[in-house]
Amino acid sequence: MPDTATGHPTSHGNVSPFVEIARADWAALAPATHLPLRETELVQLRGIGDRLDMHEVEDVYLPLSRLLNLYVTGTKKLHRDTSAFLGERAKSTPFIIGVAGSVAVGKSTVARLLREMLARWDDTPRVELVTTDGFLHPNAELQRRGLMERKGFPESYDRRALLRFVTQVKSGVPEVRAPFYSHLAYDIVPGAEVVVRQPDVLIIEGLNVLQPAASGAKLAVSDLFDFSIYVDARTHDIAQWYEERFLSLQRGAFSNPRSYFHRYAELSPAEAVARARGIWSAINEPNLEQNIRPTRSRATLVLRKDADHSVANVLLRKL
């Protein structure tokens, strides 16, 4: 049976819930859209290994930001009309977007770029981005549970805390706090917080944000999303990107004595490649195949990348 996210019929004659749009056709959907974004800003938004340029922004992300703007506008109108129907005073609630995908696939860059682009629309000036890294259990707790080698798997997160956070933001709580995660320390920073204050749009980015509800839970975080994006690519391409990113970090951030991974800084090139491939095979690939990719069909939209990191086509869920 073909992949359910390809847009092709299955062997049973059932069609996908997605419509597949070629890049050229997608780029033509928002020809009049113009959101000022400078090359210097792209450099700051671009993740390690990402080949994001203005051509990619114009072809892929301008139409996506326009589509998201339509969804935001439509959701606000529906909320106002429903409140009027019920005889209630309409209360503004944030539009919540989930961004999911594998390690090294570029989802963080997508989330950062959308934050900047959506904030340029007149009706969504306040856009916040929160990553689920802050909801990982602290390393000490992961060690206590024997989960350090499964960091990034669903069980390594405090899913109740994440659900509570998103619920409070969605409910319009004036100020909601989340733990702060340091990639340098590879751990939650005690006493440090991320504060979200009633944004127009909240973007939640993470490996497992499209996971169904945990066993025994009535609600999943994804149930609170108004729109969700899955960043997709072939496994062997993602593996190559992960290896390239690891080697780049080894030459850069890992050289910092305060880095959790400082011990890798002195590896030879061959040793570094072997270590990157070992981590990918033992942790990241199993997590992708067992937990992350199976949630792809839950997304509203799928960005499918080619080996050069460019988006080749877009799959949009049929209304």
Curated annotation (Swiss-Prot):
Belongs to the prokaryotic pantothenate kinase family. It is found in: Cytoplasm. It comes from Clavibacter michiganensis subsp. michiganensis (strain NCPPB 382). This is Pantothenate kinase. InterPro entries: P-loop_NTPase (IPR027417), PanK (IPR004566), PRK/URK (IPR006083). Its EC number is 2.7.1.33. It catalyses: (R)-pantothenate + ATP = (R)-4'-phosphopantothenate + ADP + H(+). CDD domains: PanK. Keywords: ATP-binding, Coenzyme A biosynthesis, Cytoplasm, Kinase, Nucleotide-binding, Transferase. ATP binds at residues 101-108. Pathway: Cofactor biosynthesis; coenzyme A biosynthesis; CoA from (R)-pantothenate: step 1/5. GO terms for biological process: coenzyme A biosynthetic process.
